[in-house]
């Protein structure tokens, strides 16, 4: 990843991808795994940074950047952009039932939900395989959804092919709706997010069928919940069919997705792994509180131990993905304390929140588009230019 020694990852990628459920790697946190998790976090963070959330924009709900410029423009590192290329965007309909309002910008019939990327040839050399990444976007306003969350569980048999299982797996209605809803009248959501992603994964698996491959699904907050469902679907329905292609989800601040039946199914699916990064004071991974079960392996962090952050902090800080990555960078496990083990800029934690101590002189919520997307033309008049269009320049 952007902060990983390439040779180490290339040689150990199956171990780092969870082949042995990360045994012996979490406490103390393995250096290569630490960097790898942060790298996948950066791929998830890019979805938040690129999303047009301003309701007054005619492009609200879209991605600011085209596919070919995405990783470069969404503030991902140069190294990271060189390791992956985005091959597809995917969308979900804004009318999905049971979806918390903060997940969507409601003035569009569909919302951009994330992207599919694949390792470049340089990425293959650095990562040891052709990694396919599915990155899900999180919420628009991260915390407001908690007050209105619908905890209804519904059958997942239609997605996971789990008919006849006992207990039958059930999942959160809202997460399932985001994943499976479609709108024939929509330009972008004629197919569900599930179908859009499945089609692209099938295409990439066929294109690289003679290579060693992996699939990694990443997300933060509600995006992590849908990523969990997505990863289970990929394995349950054999989309990783070419050879032994492992599927791993890296989920930051993930709310619970399903019941004990879903956990049983998840645990039984071959080649499926999930690393659940949880910040101890963050309440989101503890929701919904009843009737649901955790899946995967937990990587605990505690940003309250960081000497860089204001104390005691607040829920917005504890839930922030940038703060999560800061926590991963400095986590010391059971021995306690906090020490940055990788060179990750502490200014990043203030990108969207007010977390850093005043002595670092970094303004809170500093990540704003220059002039709010307004550009002055040759005629001296200002015009909103906050959207490049999805189509890559090479396709135009």
From Swiss-Prot:
GO MF annotations, alphabetized: phospholipase A1 activity
Active site: 221 (acyl-ester intermediate), 221 (charge relay system), 282 (charge relay system), 319 (charge relay system)
Pfam family, one: Lipase_3
Highest taxon above the source species: Eukaryota
EC number assigned by the record: 3.1.1.-
Primary location: cytoplasm
Coiled-coil intervals: none
Keyword Lipid metabolism: yes
Xref: Gene3D superfamilies: alpha/beta hydrolase
GO biological process, one term: lipid catabolic process
Signal peptide annotation: none
Any single Gene Ontology cellular-component annotation: cytoplasm
Subcellular location as annotated: Cytoplasm
Enzyme class: hydrolase
Keyword Transport: no
Family, per entry: Belongs to the AB hydrolase superfamily. Lipase family.
Function: Acylhydrolase that catalyzes the hydrolysis of phospholipids at the sn-1 position.
PANTHER family referenced in this protein's UniProt entry, alphabetically: PHOSPHOLIPASE A1-IIGAMMA (PTHR31828:SF1)
Name the UniProt record assigns to this protein: Phospholipase A1-II 4
Source species: Oryza sativa subsp. japonica
């Amino acid at each position: 990843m952007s902060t990983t020694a390439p040779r180490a990852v290339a040689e150990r990628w199956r171990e780092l991808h969870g082949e042995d459920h990360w045994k012996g790697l979490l406490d103390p946190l393995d250096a290569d795994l630490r960097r790898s998790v942060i790298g996948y976090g950066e791929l998830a963070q890019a979805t938040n940074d690129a999303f047009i959330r301003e309701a007054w924009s005619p492009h609200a709900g879209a991605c600011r950047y085209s596919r070919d410029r995405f990783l470069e423009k969404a503030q991902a590192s140069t190294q990271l952009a060189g390791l992956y290329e985005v091959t597809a965007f995917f969308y979900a309909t804004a009318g999905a039932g049971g979806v918390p309002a903060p997940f969507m910008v409601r003035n569009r019939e569909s919302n951009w939900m994330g992207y599919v990327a694949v390792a470049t040839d340089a990425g293959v050399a650095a990562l040891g395989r052709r990694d396919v990444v599915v990155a899900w976007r999180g919420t628009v306003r991260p915390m407001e959804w908690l007050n209105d969350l619908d905890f209804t569980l519904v059958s997942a048999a239609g997605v996971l092919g789990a008919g006849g299982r006992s207990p039958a797996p059930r999942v959160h209605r809202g997460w399932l709706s985001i994943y499976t809803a479609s709108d024939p009248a929509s330009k972008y959501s004629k197919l569900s997010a599930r179908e859009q992603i499945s089609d692209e994964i099938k295409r990439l698996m066929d294109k690289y069928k003679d290579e060693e491959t992996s699939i990694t699904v990443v997300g933060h907050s509600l995006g992590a919940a849908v990523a969990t469902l997505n990863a289970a679907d990929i394995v349950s329905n054999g989309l990783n069919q070419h050879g032994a292609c492992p599927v791993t989800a890296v989920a930051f601040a993930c709310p619970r997705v399903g019941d004990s039946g879903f956990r049983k199914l998840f645990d039984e699916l071959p080649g499926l792994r999930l690393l659940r990064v949880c910040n101890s004071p963050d309440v989101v991974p503890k929701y919904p509180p009843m009737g649901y079960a955790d899946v995967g392996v937990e990587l605990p962090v505690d940003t309250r131990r960081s000497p860089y952050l204001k104390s005691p902090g607040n829920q917005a800080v504890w839930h922030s993905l940038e703060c999560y990555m800061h926590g991963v960078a400095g986590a010391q496990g059971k021995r306690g304390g906090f020490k940055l083990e990788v060179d990750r800029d502490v200014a990043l934690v203030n990108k969207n929140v007010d977390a850093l101590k005043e002595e670092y002189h970094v303004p809170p919520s500093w990540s704003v588009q220059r002039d709010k997307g307004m550009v002055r033309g040759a005629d001296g008049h200002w015009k909103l230019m906050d959207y490049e269009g999805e189509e890559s320049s090479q396709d135009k």
